[in-house]
Amino acid sequence: MAKPIPRIGSRRNGRRIPKGVIHVQASFNNTIVTVTDVRGRVVSWSSAGTCGFRGTRRGTPFAAQTAAGNAIRTVVDQGMQRAEVMIKGPGLGRDAALRAIRRSGILLSFVRDVTPMPHNGCRPPKKRRV
């Protein structure tokens, strides 16, 4: 079983974190933004659902932009200047979250797409007929 990654205190503590990793998971239904330090310990996180969006509005680009802004605001206050971005998933919020991260003033060392792609693995679900 995977060990849980320990969390670094509360969101408001005064730890200085100069460099970190921003993980963006964009599904069709929601966008989750997690900011970790370089060792993988969670510093801050936010999602479209925690920002007050409900139902189908959680999957929108504006909701992803708001979630990314909320997650990054706390780490900018803790002194983060440089970050790497890992984007996962096919959702609409991918570009909007990246735009919000770029606008925050953090220098991005690289942006990597880590969406899992099957090499002809499991059979996909049947196509929807509406």
Curated annotation (Swiss-Prot):
It holds the Pfam family Ribosomal_S11. GO terms for molecular function: rRNA binding; structural constituent of ribosome. Keywords: Chloroplast, Plastid, Ribonucleoprotein, Ribosomal protein, RNA-binding, rRNA-binding. It is found in: Plastid, Chloroplast. GO terms for cellular component: chloroplast; ribonucleoprotein complex; ribosome. It comes from the Eukaryota. GO terms for biological process: translation. The keyword Ribonucleoprotein applies. InterPro entries: Ribosomal_uS11 (IPR001971), Ribosomal_uS11_bac-type (IPR019981), Ribosomal_uS11_CS (IPR018102), Ribosomal_uS11_sf (IPR036967). The keyword Chloroplast applies. Coiled coil: none annotated. Its main location: plastid. Part of the 30S ribosomal subunit. Belongs to the universal ribosomal protein uS11 family. This is Small ribosomal subunit protein uS11c. The lineage of its organism: Eukaryota, Viridiplantae, Streptophyta, Embryophyta, Tracheophyta.
